[in-house]
Amino acid sequence: MTTTVETFVPEAPPKPKKAIKGEKLRGYDKVARIPIKVIPTVEAPKKPDWIRVKMSSPAEVDRIKKTLRKQKLYTVCEEAACPNLPQCFGDGTATFMIMGDICTRRCPFCDVAHGRPNELDKDEPRHTAETIQGLGLKYAVITSVDRDDLKDGGAQHFVDVINESKALSPNCLIEILVPDFRGRMDVALDLLTETAPDVFNHNIETVPRLYKAFRPGSDYQHSLDLLKQYKARRPDIATKCGFMVGLGETEEEVYALLDDLKAHDVDMITIGQYLQPSKNHAPVDRYVHPDEFQRYMDYGKKIGFFSIWAGPMVRSSYFADRQYYGEDCPAPIRSKKALEAEGKLGC
């Protein structure tokens, strides 16, 4: 009798969906075509006690969401699944995301959808300005998806939002968190030099060694140059940059990154813990202890940044107004039991 042994053939991964104009691609469909593949996480590491968010007023959260939907606006808080949303919305603050909710990049750490975006909404600058006025904001953060399909990368749209917002709320400070304007830096800088925000922010996201894996389509030196060139054109405007830890970088690489940012004339820094949005996103390499974040802040102050905020829940626009005015970074929320275990509570 002959026994037939079947050869195991691994199941081929599903073919990712094609990008159709106006259709959002998330999860596997978003990251399947990046150079370094993301292996879906089977079991995520347990979050430590310092990954905590302070809850605020549910009524205020609901009020802001209703206002945003009425004006057909997006926030990065919602689209990127920011864990601080309840606290920020509860405190009456939000980061507006302009130029739609579909990004032309596929960064595996980000939860914003990828695809072929729709045309710009010509009414969005006015709607954003009306919302800022309606919420009575004194400090507004405006960010965007990447729009590699636009000749100016969306710089003119930023200008339109700034102009409309300043017209209705002249006392409101405007911070813009811009993409890298890849291939369009000069035209973007020309526009944003002429019509300047109060803070020019661009996130470098991670250390250079990890760029290919986590920022496909972006360039570390290009981001540094964008920050330095803007400061050279508008030395009166504060520049700001943020990045994540917990992706696989070393502590020494973080210090080197801070040195690079200081050498490129950045004024303010934010450093936060990377949190995996879903199993199809890049995995968390480690949860960085609050003591390590404190070392980064100590080093940043030592080398002369105007302000450096670093902590597990810090994000680029986290209490941006407080950082602008020079306040200290809020301490992470810790459990009494954990602090006792680390010997950080007195008798």
Swiss-Prot record:
Its EC number is 2.8.1.8. Residues 89-306 form the Radical SAM core domain. GO terms for molecular function: 4 iron, 4 sulfur cluster binding; lipoate synthase activity; metal ion binding. It is an enzyme of class 2 (transferase). Keywords: 4Fe-4S, Cytoplasm, Iron, Iron-sulfur, Metal-binding, S-adenosyl-L-methionine, Transferase. Signal peptide: none annotated. SUPFAM superfamilies: Radical SAM enzymes (SSF102114). It is found in: Cytoplasm. [4Fe-4S] cluster 2 binds at C103, C107, C110. Pathway: Protein modification; protein lipoylation via endogenous pathway; protein N(6)-(lipoyl)lysine from octanoyl-[acyl-carrier-protein]: step 2/2. PANTHER family: LIPOYL SYNTHASE (PTHR10949), LIPOYL SYNTHASE, MITOCHONDRIAL (PTHR10949:SF0). This is Lipoyl synthase.
